[in-house]
Swiss-Prot record:
Keywords: Acetylation, Activator, Cell junction, Coiled coil, DNA-binding, Isopeptide bond, Methylation, mRNA processing, mRNA splicing, Nucleus, Phosphoprotein, Spliceosome, Transcription, Transcription regulation, Ubl conjugation. This is Pinin. The lineage of its organism: Eukaryota, Metazoa, Chordata, Craniata, Vertebrata. It is found in: Nucleus speckle; Cell junction, Desmosome. GO terms for cellular component: catalytic step 2 spliceosome; desmosome; nuclear speck. The modification N6-acetyllysine is found at K238. Transcriptional activator binding to the E-box 1 core sequence of the E-cadherin promoter gene; the core-binding sequence is 5'CAGGTG-3'. Capable of reversing CTBP1-mediated transcription repression. Auxiliary component of the splicing-dependent multiprotein exon junction complex (EJC) deposited at splice junction on mRNAs. The EJC is a dynamic structure consisting of core proteins and several peripheral nuclear and cytoplasmic associated factors that join the complex only transiently either during EJC assembly or during subsequent mRNA metabolism. Its main location: nucleus. GO terms for biological process: cell-cell adhesion; mRNA processing; RNA splicing. Residues 611-631, 690-708 have a biased composition (Basic residues). The modification Phosphothreonine is found at T124.
Length: 773
């Protein structure tokens, strides 16, 4: 390390000597010592020279010039002042007055009297020339004057040509001197700049060398200290303590060797760090020198460009003065070269701009593609979410259906015997028809299952409303809506074989009389001549309640039915020997007793309608089958008596009224019996179709289907017996010609009373909802 310190010290001394030489060169060039501290004013003057100085120095210099009086004043003040300006305005006013005065004078002056004067004779040019030719003295005089004028003009011409030549020479000499002076000045500036740069570089080298010397000295001191410590044993704990024993043993000898190894490793690491630090310090000035060289190259190029521009300007001036065509051609060539260079630069810039625009367009396209992909992913994810929701709804619906079936089985087993006894009183003549359970299972769509799941959730609320109402509500108007004809692709299924009745038109009148809420209120009575198209198609159960009355009324605004309704197959319905004129079906929605209606017209689905409504309603109503059948017997008897009284009061002849009442009562009972039988058959078909797909509930469903078959057979036999008696009664009612008009009147009256009752029912429902809230 001692050798390294010596070498560094030698380098430092050499650098100091070179710095001294640079300072001497600067002193020769500038005439002053760069190490001397200059006064502030002199420094500002030096900085504000040509091309140098900025900021406050230049401002102070300007102030100095303005104070000395050599330069222009700081602010040109108006010496004359405001009075002179006002006086100028006054002058302009006076001038304007003087201009306007002559006009006024012309107006004021009186007109002069006209006078006739003889004109003087003008001498012609010929007369004048003749007079001059006659005078010889005048000729001589004119010649002398002309000669003098020509001589003076020639002298002026000669003098002007000589002056222009001298001026041209002087201008050329001055231009050359100026160019030389500029070159010398630039050289001096470059030398001065280089000298100062050398001085800075030398100073940085000196600083680095001084730092290196200091580091080397510190390293030497550290090495000397550690060389003394290496003979001792170092403790493993920190802070490290160095000790030595008076008597050495092999264990202590091992400890000394270990400590020496550790210390030597520490010395080597410290040496490596020292060498790396010195290398870094040497690399820094190299980088600075490289940057300085680059700056010098740039400056040299700028100087060359300025010199070339100066030469081109000199050539242009010479060519303007001398008018040499050859030089003109050279200047044009030089200008063309410059224009080409400028055009190349412009073309390069345009190419760069085009490349940038292309890059931007590519980026925009990539962004648009990414956005489109994201939108597609979102669209793909949306149907997946919809399918998940549908699966959840189906799962919930299946659970609810299983639970309801278990409850229905228990209720139906208990109510088989009393329901058969009670329904036997109500059953009237009915047509036989077949039900296909396999088609029912196939025709049901998952959309209907979703709707059934939603309606199953609403059924508990309806049960609570039924429990809260001890008295039945007034009659509701149920209007069948005409269903639009389905698409031609759907083929109608084969018609069932029906037993026609020759004498009576195929209409069944269902009379249902509500139980009075109070004794003072009148009991509205409604009649419905409803054609029952009996279809082999799977049908929805619609159990008629004692408060619901079906009326065929003309609908002013036909409603658009859902897609499930439009897809239902069309069937030509033939009943009692009468073919309906139009191939339309009137979908009637089954109305629940406690259901709140917002619209004035309630759409009700009867047994004659297709599979448009879901199975959930029929299942929900199957629970209350026994209670409804009990009330049906009393309602049928009361409806028959009320129908006789109403028809007799509205008709003109007593014979026609009695026949009409008997026919209406028979038709109403037959309609109710048909609905009961059809609902039982459809429910049995549904149970059969479901029992096939569910293996774990086969035993229970088998028992239930057997019970229902028994009920169906007994109901059909009774309907056959009652149909004969009903047909004989209907023949008597058909003899009267005016029966149809009377029926229409009764329908209109019943519709009015039903509308009133439905409005009062809405008010009660709204009151109940408000109380619950």
């Amino acid at each position: 390390m001692a050798v390294a310190v010596r070498t560094l010290q030698e380098q430092l001394e050499k650098a100091k000597e070179s710095l001294k030489n640079v300072d001497e060169n600067i002193r020769k060039l500038t005439g002053r010592d760069p190490n001397d501290v200059r006064p502030i004013q002199a420094r500002l003057l030096a900085l504000s020279g040509p091309g140098g100085g900025r900021g406050r120095g230049s401002l102070l210099l300007r102030r100095g010039f303005s104070d000395s009086g050599g330069g222009p004043p700081a602010k040109q003040r108006d010496l004359e002042g405001a009075v002179s300006r006002l006086g100028g305005e006054r002058r302009t006013r006076r001038e304007s007055r003087q201009e306007s005065d002559p006009e006024d004078d012309d107006v004021k002056k009186p007109a002069l009297q006209s006078s006739v004067v003889a004109t003087s004779k003008e001498r012609t040019r010929r007369d004048l020339i003749q007079d001059q030719n006659m005078d010889e003295k005048g000729k001589q005089r004119n010649r002398r004057i002309f000669g003098l004028l020509m001589g003076t003009l020639q002298k002026f011409k000669q003098e002007s040509t000589v002056a222009t030549e001298r001026q041209k020479r002087r201008q050329e000499i001055e231009q050359k001197l100026e160019v030389q002076a500029e070159e010398e000045r630039k050289q001096v500036e470059n030398e001065r700049r280089e000298l100062f740069e050398e001085r800075r570089a030398k100073q940085t080298e000196l600083r680095l060398l001084e730092q290196k010397v200091e580091l080397a000295q510190l390293q030497e001191e550290w090495n000397e200290h550690n060389a003394k410590i290496i003979k001792y044993i170092r403790t493993k704990t920190k802070p490290h303590l160095f000790y030595i024993l008076g008597r050495m043993c092999p264990a202590t000898q091992k400890l000394i060797e270990e400590s020496q190894r550790k210390m030597n490793a520490l010395f080597e690491g410290r040496r490596i760090e020292f060498a790396e630090q010195i290398n870094k310090m040497e690399a820094r000035p190299r980088r600075q020198s490289m940057k300085e060289k680059e700056h010098q190259v740039v400056r040299n190029e700028e100087q060359k460009a300025e010199q070339e521009e100066g030469k081109v300007a000199q050539r242009e001036e010479e060519l303007e003065e001398t008018g040499n065509q050859h030089n003109d051609v050279e200047i044009e060539e030089a200008g063309e070269e410059e224009e080409k260079e400028i055009g190349i630069v412009h073309s390069d810039a345009e190419k760069e701009q085009e490349e940038e625009e292309q890059k931007q367009e590519m980026e925009v396209k990539i962004e648009e593609e990414t956005e489109v992909r994201e939108s597609e992913k979102q669209q793909d994810s949306q149907p997946e979410e919809v399918m998940d929701v549908l699966e959840m709804l189906l799962h919930v619906a299946v659970k609810n259906v299983i639970a309801e079936q278990e409850v229905m089985e228990t209720n139906q087993v208990e109510s088989v015997e009393p329901s058969e006894n009670e329904t036997s009183k109500e059953l009237e003549p009915e047509m036989e028809f077949e039900v296909e359970p396999d088609k029912e299972c196939k025709s049901l769509s998952p959309v209907r299952e979703n709707a059934s799941a939603l309606e199953m959730e609403n059924e508990p609320e309806e049960k609570e409303e039924r429990e809260s109402e001890p008295q039945p509500e007034p009659v509701r108007h149920l209007q069948p809506l005409p269903q639009p004809e389905p698409e031609p692709e759907l083929q109608p299924e084969p018609q069932p074989q029906l037993q026609p009745e020759p004498q009576l038109q195929p209409q069944l009148q269902l009379q249902l009389q509500p139980q009075p809420q109070s004794q003072s209120q009148p009991q509205p009575q409604l009649q419905l001549p409803l054609p029952l198209p009996l279809q082999p198609q799977p049908q929805v159960q619609a159990q008629s309640q004692p408060q619901a009355v079906l009326q065929p009324q003309p609908v002013s605004q036909p409603e658009t039915l859902p897609l499930a309704v439009l897809q239902a197959p069309v069937q030509v319905i033939q009943e009692q020997g009468h073919l309906l004129p139009e191939r339309k079906e009137f979908p009637v929605e089954s109305v629940k007793l406690t259901e709140v209606t917002v619209e004035p017209v309630l759409i009700v689905h009867s047994d004659s309608k297709t599979k448009t409504k879901t199975r959930s309603r029929s299942r929900g109503r199957a629970r209350n089958k026994t209670s409804k059948s009990r009330s049906r017997s009393s309602s049928s008897s009361s409806s028959s008596s009320s129908s006789t009284s109403s028809s007799s009061g509205g008709s003109s002849s007593s014979g026609s009224s009695s026949s009409r009442s008997s026919s209406s009562s028979s038709s109403s009972t037959s309609g109710s019996s048909r609905r009961d039988s059809s609902s039982s058959t459809t429910s049995s078909s549904e149970s059969r179709s479901r029992s096939r797909g569910r293996g774990h509930n086969r035993d229970r469903k088998h028992r239930r289907s057997v019970d229902r078959k028994r009920r169906d057979t007994s109901g059909l036999e009774r309907s056959h017996k009652s149909s004969k008696g009903g047909s004989s009664r209907d023949t008597k009612g058909s003899k009267d010609k005016n029966s149809r008009s009377d029926r229409k009147r009764s329908i209109s009256e019943s519709s009015r009373s039903g509308k009133r009752s439905s409005r009062s029912e809405r008010d009660r429902k709204s009151d109940r909802k408000d109380k619950r809230r």
